[in-house]
Amino acid sequence: MTFSSFEIFKKKSGTLIPISLNKDIPFKSKRIFLIYGNREFVRGNHAHKKCSQFFLPIHGKMELSVIDKKNNKKVKLDSKKGKGVLLKPLTWCKLSFKTKNSVIMVFCDREYEFNDYIENYEDFINIIKKKKK
């Protein structure tokens, strides 16, 4: 898990947070998607075998519950902070929205592949236990 910060330019007319795809996103993006949700909506609850994902909050606050072979923590994201987080493959992630009308953008280093998903938590734990050895 790696965090990235973005420069924030605030004026009375609004806030600008520029993002350079080739510089600020830590890989060449092959897929981008948006997730919309309201308070206490939960998404995710899975891991990827090969896909890395970069999560960037667009509007509102959200929390990622992240489990990998080194971490088991909750990561708070806020669109006003100009920060995103990179999750590598074999990272279990549960996304919880904490404010109304929250939006998060997710950049992926791979196209969608059905077989890349690990949706059973016990299977995931067994896989990362084997990787620790």
Name these PLM-found stretches:
Residues 1-85, 100-108, 112-123, 127-133:
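Non-catalytic, conserved peripheral segments adjacent to functional cores
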